[in-house]
């Protein structure tokens, strides 16, 4: 009997997302329920955005939750390397195999040519897609351009008629017309693969038997199925999990809710409660009880109990469930966990240099730096009253800073400072008028340690969370303002 092997394959391009943890949990439970193996693979082919720091955060977040893997970049295994950036030669080999078999082809189109192609198609009312012009090149022309070292990508051929039947473990057979599929790029000009080629090659070579992924990937499933067919490989069984959603039913995103696992760890949530809550996202125990452990979920796991309705990720409900877990702890363990959370040595070492020179006794630390250990800070609305800025200007400033910080790739003091400075200058304001407002939003106080240092230490999710709280305190942002201010956002350097 074949051993069940599942995997999670996140991209290390930002904070570890609760959606990644959710999909990892269901893959883990499915594998363990069947006595199988759960694998961690890192999809880091986006070299511009991928970082080892983000990769380590993924490791830390999953381990904090209690989701462990038997093979991966940090523990090794018989099917490595487990970072896609280290498997380039493997992908080159299989991309060339597809070309040799006539299932893929080199495309020499420049970005300008592709832009013009799409513009012309849109002008005709057509769906923009690659038109296959490289297929018209003669073999001699292709060989000449390849020999000359001309930059090119490798694209896959796709049928233009009929439908692809996608066998989904939750929905049954799903029919998707082939004419919705583009001639997907498989290998980029830099020699690295796109998601589609790397995904299929890795899953095959690593012996993955079942793939549980988010339903956002269902529309592109025919490309993966076609690649398995082209290679002559047996494809894994596919399961497309319902997406996590905000309380307003929109797709879960950091613009409306904190989405980083690290945020919830920093807020003092228990990993058991977090896993418990993620386990209830579209799934339920046979006896319908709300509180259960990871092992209990594994023991009772059955995909037939997954509901296709979009599960709502609600922080208030998560907080309620976390309270159930906290109150069930023995008092001694409760005290121990509080100490571990509040007096984390690494975190304290980040804070200490900014506090030590400002206090005369230890008792003065809490009033000065207590905000480092809080979730929200609930500032007094009077702290946002400005002699130079109107109430609308304050809200606009805070909202634009929040949006710009959401796209910040490197969370460091210098980049945070530059971001705030850029917003302030774009609104023709003075930094000295803006910073007291940031103090109020981030620390809940009129003054404290450097707010820029504090933002760096608190991290992106807690910082953004507090900015959102401040904006809500001041009345929020209307749909009209949201639309108008987003136009300003694009002009900020």
Swiss-Prot record:
UniProt KW Transport keyword: no
GO MF annotation terms: ATP binding; glutamate-tRNA ligase activity; tRNA binding; zinc ion binding
Annotated residues for binding of ATP: 254
Top-rank lineage group of the source organism: Bacteria
Sequence motif 'HIGH' region, residues: 10-20
UniProt entry keywords in alphabetical sequence: Aminoacyl-tRNA synthetase, ATP-binding, Cytoplasm, Ligase, Nucleotide-binding, Protein biosynthesis
Major enzyme class: ligase
Entry's EC annotation: 6.1.1.17
Pfam families according to UniProt: Anticodon_2 (PF19269), tRNA-synt_1c (PF00749)
GO cellular component, one term: cytosol
Catalytic activity: tRNA(Glu) + L-glutamate + ATP = L-glutamyl-tRNA(Glu) + AMP + diphosphate
Extent of motif 'KMSKS' region: 251-255
Location in or out of the cell: Cytoplasm
Function: Catalyzes the attachment of glutamate to tRNA(Glu) in a two-step reaction: glutamate is first activated by ATP to form Glu-AMP and then transferred to the acceptor end of tRNA(Glu).
Family statement drawn from the similarity comment of this UniProt entry: Belongs to the class-I aminoacyl-tRNA synthetase family. Glutamate--tRNA ligase type 1 subfamily.
Subunit structure: Monomer.
HAMAP family assigned: Glu_tRNA_synth_type1 (MF_00022)
Protein name in the entry: Glutamate--tRNA ligase
Organism field: Pseudomonas fluorescens (strain ATCC BAA-477 / NRRL B-23932 / Pf-5)
Phylogenetic classification of the source organism: Bacteria, Pseudomonadati, Pseudomonadota, Gammaproteobacteria, Pseudomonadales
